[in-house]
């Protein structure tokens, strides 16, 4: 593995391991939830961090095992997704994937968030700004599939790109 390359599913982990943690914007929210935003606009930085260019948002909390907090966090997540796609060009295709184990509350937030979204990439909805697809994906132990395998196939088929 290269000296300047770090691997994690989360951009935030890679920032911390690479000594770039000052690039993460931290914001305290209600119920002890912290929002951390990593904006990798620069190609050189995104290469060093080992993540494609983009905006990465992480929510950190220890209270996701409580239904009240989980519901609040799911609302925040779905709102964040809506904000992130709001700046895209009309007709862009957005693929939102919730990862986790739906059988364990603390790990089911991805699935719960996908249920809150309103997919608009359906044939009868023709006048939407962007075309949203939402999918929840279980963990490898429950599905036998690695997340990147399924996401790669979805990405190839859906081709979520900004409209030209």
What are these regions (language model features)?
Residues 1-53:
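N-terminal amphipathic/basic leader segments beginning at the initiator methionine
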Residues 61-67, 71, 75-163:
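Conserved mixed alpha/beta catalytic, RNA-binding, or beta-rich assembly cores of soluble enzyme
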């Amino acid at each position: 593995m290269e000296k300047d390359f770090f691997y994690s599913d989360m951009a935030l982990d890679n920032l911390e391991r690479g000594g770039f943690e000052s690039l993460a914007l931290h914001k305290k929210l209600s119920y002890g939830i912290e929002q951390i935003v990593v904006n990798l606009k620069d190609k050189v930085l995104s290469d060093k961090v080992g993540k494609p260019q983009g905006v990465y948002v992480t929510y950190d909390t220890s209270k996701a095992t409580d239904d009240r907090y989980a519901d609040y966090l799911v609302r925040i997540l779905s709102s964040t997704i809506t904000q992130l796609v709001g700046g895209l060009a009309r007709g862009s295709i957005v693929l939102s994937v919730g990862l986790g184990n739906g059988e364990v509350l603390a790990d089911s937030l991805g699935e719960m968030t996908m249920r809150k979204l309103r997919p608009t990439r359906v044939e009868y909805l023709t006048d939407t700004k962007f075309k949203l697809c939402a999918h929840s994906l279980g963990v490898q132990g429950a599905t036998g599939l690695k997340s990147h395998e399924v996401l790669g196939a979805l990405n190839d088929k859906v081709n979520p790109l900004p409209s030209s």
